[in-house]
């Protein structure tokens, strides 16, 4: 069933972690679940240009902790952290609680072209600019190969190039072992709104395998001759520690 089930949901607890980490009773669970959905929707709409790959949410007592993985952290942080304060007030307004403590950490995506969501976002932007889908897919494959991914699969469906009959086309480079549970598969979906209709985009990225008795995966595109890449930027919010 590896080709039919969601790759991330199939690997929860093996190679994937939950995007939301908190516990709630049966009464408060739907409320907190709606809050998570509102927060992620708000962040994607307001900071879509920042290239946000994922939003991780954790709750401890009355404190809300967010971790934003983005390709351009400077867009979110702003000058002297002014963007963080604006984001915090926006989240408090979204959930309807101005007194809620919100802690925000912004982490830079180390390999932008090896991230499934950012690749899907790039493909969607090109298709919305009316670039031919075959050329767009080829460019995305080249970018991912330069980033050193072990395998990549891209699927686009809809009225491709304005065709009268909708169809689905896909291409694959390298290995994408969807049946292997220890394989770290990064999966993302995206929609491109074109003049001919909506195109659906799916991206699978194979980053390596989690070996037994090891916590770290095989690094993407690792080579013993190459030096380690620079450490990704991380902006940790410590404004609530003194309060």
UniProtKB/Swiss-Prot annotation:
Q: Which Pfam families match?
A: KH_2, Ribosomal_S3_C
Q: Keywords for this entry?
A: Ribonucleoprotein, Ribosomal protein, RNA-binding, rRNA-binding
GO MF annotation terms: mRNA binding; rRNA binding; structural constituent of ribosome
What range does the record give for the signal peptide?
none
Note down the stretches annotated as region Disordered: 216-243
Q: A Gene Ontology CC term for this entry?
A: cytosolic small ribosomal subunit
Give the top-rank taxon of the lineage listed in the UniProt record for this protein: Bacteria
PANTHER family referenced in this protein's UniProt entry, alphabetically: 30S/40S RIBOSOMAL PROTEIN S3 (PTHR11760), SMALL RIBOSOMAL SUBUNIT PROTEIN US3C (PTHR11760:SF19)
- Say what the protein does: Binds the lower part of the 30S subunit head. Binds mRNA in the 70S ribosome, positioning it for translation.
Q: Which family does it belong to?
A: Belongs to the universal ribosomal protein uS3 family.
Subunit note: Part of the 30S ribosomal subunit. Forms a tight complex with proteins S10 and S14.
Q: What is this protein called?
A: Small ribosomal subunit protein uS3
Q: Upper lineage ranks?
A: Bacteria, Bacillati, Cyanobacteriota, Cyanophyceae, Synechococcales
Task: Give the gene that encodes this protein.
Answer: rpsC
